[in-house]
Amino acid sequence: MRNKAFLSALALIIISVLFISCGKSTKPKKQIDTKPVSVKQFDTPPGADPSVSAEQGGEGFKGEGWETKTDYNILGDPKAIKGGPFNMRIPDFPNTLRIYGKDANSYVNNLMENMVYESLLSTDPVTEDWIPGLATHWKVSEDKKQFWFRINPNARWADGKPVVAEDVVATWKLLVDPGILEAYSNILYGTYEQPVAESKYIVSVKTKELNWRQFLYFAGSMR
């Protein structure tokens, strides 16, 4: 009987301790520094390169014969308060921090890619129409096998250097390089001819096959 009473008392003590430990924590919350981080090295003036003509996508570009959109919906609320912590669940741990190549297809890598790099075009979250991204204007040939994009002259890399048409060409070359060990990208982007930087801000590409998805893939994923 004594042993039973002792065990009962011990059980009550343990349960009480567990309840107390599960109570409110007095540990202060960790303060997160949300100050902006900058790696800017170059002070490139805003706007287009003065040496590039309007016809070649520079200052004064009219966009006649091109498509664009200035009135469109965006995700999120523009009135949202900036700054502060943002908690989210990450379901996997990346094997690499590359956004292309072997083992790059993970939740974290895709998240970082969309946060760091902007695609040529995006889609309106309500109407699903094409809207500007890295490119302000776009154009499709009559046979639907050649596409043109005009890079936003105000686009800048994190270090301050301007984004130019040659950067799009460089991305395509990377995606078709067998050395990245990503057969899917090699095959998909191999269905296009090498893009051409027609000027500092205008890049064009021809597709090897007639398919409505070809514009979708290039405009929506090329960065």
Model-derived regions, located:
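Extracytoplasmic
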Residues: 81-85, 115, 133-135, 142-146, ...
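Bacterial N-terminal signal peptides that target proteins for export
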Residues: 1-9
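Bacterial signal peptide processing site
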Residues: 23-25
